[in-house]
Amino acid sequence: MAHPHLLAERISRLSSALEKGLYERSHAIRLCLLAALSGESVFLLGPPGIAKSLIARRLKFAFQRARAFEYLMTRFSTPEEVFGPLSIQALKDEGRYERLTTGYLPEAEIVFLDEIWKAGPAILNTLLTAINERHFRNGAFEEKIPMRLLVAASNELPEADSSLEALYDRMLIRLWLDKVQDKANFRSMLVSQQDESDNPVPASLQVSDEEYQQWQKDIGAISLPDPVFELIFTLRQQLDNLPNAPYVSDRRWKKAIRLLQASAFFSGRDAVAPIDLILLKDCLWYDAQSLNLMQQQLEILMTGHAWQQQAMLTRLGGIVQRRLQLQQQQSDKTAFTVIKEGGMFSRRPHYTLPPEASASTLTLLLQKPLKLHDMEVIHITFDRSALELWLTKGGEIRGKLNGIGFAQTLNMEVDNAQHPVVRDISLQGTRLALPGAAEDSMPAEIKQQLETLENDWRQQHTRFSEQQHCLFIHSDWLGRIEASLQDVGEQIRQAQQC
């Protein structure tokens, strides 16, 4: 078996070759390739003329000697046109009911059925068996069919509560396509002279029959780690609790997990990773409403839980709360305290300075910086006599901000715990402390918890960086996940700097 990273590189190059000359169809090609490599079915929804059939034709070139069958369904289509005509010779000579399947669906590896919902019951019933069991009953014999990929297409969804729902449920990947949107891509498409029938894939990249069969076994060996299963189960519970969520059968969940295993395998990994779960957005929707719902639920899962983003923010909130408690305790211990001297008949209490404040000029530190008179202030210098007068009689008090310039008027008061408090213009206040009493350093307990949290964040970010090289996931999702992790990291860094 090829080295996992070499296999991932080969599949990436194979996809690039298949995408050549197709504009704004890279994601569709990649998911159809993933479906083909894992033996699943795809439904393409979109208006006529947007290269749905060309996508299916291209996938034939991913394999060596692959045969393709395509058919446009009408309400008058017969099983003979899809599964092959009856053998008149066998019926006449031997009385056997047998179809001539050469060139028809039972002998094709790649199958494209356009306007699939117009198929009649006789075709649908046989098609269901072909998709489910990869077998076709031809007369008295059960024949194994080689189909690796079924691409069904339509410009509409099947009607609810119709006989078509069983077939729709078998189509694991569902893609909603639209016209080319980008101006440059539209121009390139108009002037392109590429022959659609040309094989764009070098022989060295094409998949042999032996490789395909071996890969089916290898895909089944990819593990589903417990944390990833928990994410899947969380998503399932969220969907079950939403009133407008689509019904997802157990069979569909099981087939979707195999697709995630294939994504991991062809990305060079031996286990399903959270990044693979993004593929579920193309597997679990039913209509336009549920498509938007799945996008929202997957985004919540990927940007909030898949790499512990919300859990880390919750831990950070607890650490910050604990730090505030410790700071309050420290503030009570280190705050500058005056002595209450109010007499029995005094209309207002008055205070005196403590013995340790004996200097003629007093510099008091703000326990947290405030913006006063358009200046970021960390300490204030008072004239001792002016401070004593204010404590005794009240009135105006002035001090030099950061010990410089002229003394400025201050909004100050003494709180119930006998601590002088200075306030800014928005009335945010902070207590004052004598130099040497204020404790600016972060408590060791908090510092250790923040360092542990930062290490956990780095581990999660490293996991994401290692797993994000997944061919089948659109880069927009990677950007949103990276932004969510960076937001958590920034909040942790801000907490460390406070």
From Swiss-Prot:
Reactions catalysed, as given in the entry: ATP + H2O = ADP + phosphate + H(+)
List of residues binding ADP: Y23, G49, I50, A51, K52, S53, L54, E196
Alphabetized SUPFAM superfamilies for the sequence: P-loop containing nucleoside triphosphate hydrolases
Single GO cellular component term: cytoplasm
Gene3D superfamilies, A to Z: 1.20.58.1510, 2.40.128.430, P-loop containing nucleotide triphosphate hydrolases (3.40.50.300)
TM region(s), chain numbering: none
Any GO molecular function: ATP hydrolysis activity
Key words of the record: ATP-binding, Chaperone, Cytoplasm, Hydrolase, Nucleotide-binding
Family: Belongs to the RavA family.
Subunit structure, interactors included: Homohexamer. Interacts with ViaA.
Name by which UniProt lists this protein: Regulatory ATPase RavA
Organism per entry: Salmonella typhi
Gene name, Swiss-Prot/TrEMBL: ravA
